């Protein structure tokens, strides 16, 4: 889980509300780059499948639409006291995920602390950092890059 401000100078989560399903979140570590894709926003199975089939492999798209991740939304607005979003698999099941999920958390609406905006994404790939830097990554929309010092 990552939490950050979305307003003010240098706010890393300023554009979090513009994320769409399948947008990339990149985590650059010392030796690897992890690419996460934002999960579907809808809670309807058919819509979740159509939103995820364009970016995930077929097995993951099925898990996202009707399987173990069917109740994990890619975008959610919650109140500050809804601490269950900190759970590794925030669907109320108490299960541990067997695929990596990432949660981004910030204040909502902008310039307010009344609610929290939550974005969730599933791990898409882990690549050698040197090889990753040699190629161009296509972008289908907004994305987020987080680097390790």
Please give the residue ranges for each predicted region.
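Extracytoplasmic/periplasmic soluble domains downstream of a signal peptide or transmembrane helix
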Residues: 1-149
């Amino acid at each position: 889980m990552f939490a950050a401000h979305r307003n003010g100078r240098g706010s890393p989560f300023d554009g979090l509300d513009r994320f769409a399903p399948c947008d990339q979140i990149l985590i650059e570590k010392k030796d690897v780059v992890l690419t996460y894709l934002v999960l579907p926003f809808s809670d309807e199975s058919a819509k979740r499948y159509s939103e995820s089939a364009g970016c995930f492999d077929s097995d993951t798209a099925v898990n996202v639409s009707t399987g173990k991740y069917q109740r994990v939304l890619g975008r959610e607005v919650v109140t500050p006291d809804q601490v269950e979003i900190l759970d590794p698999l925030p669907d109320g099941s108490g299960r541990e995920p067997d695929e990596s999920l990432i949660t981004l958390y910030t204040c909502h609406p902008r310039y307010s602390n009344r609610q929290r905006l939550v974005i969730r994404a599933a791990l898409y790939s882990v690549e050698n950092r040197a090889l990753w830097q040699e190629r161009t990554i296509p972008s289908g929309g907004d994305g987020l890059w987080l680097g390790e010092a």
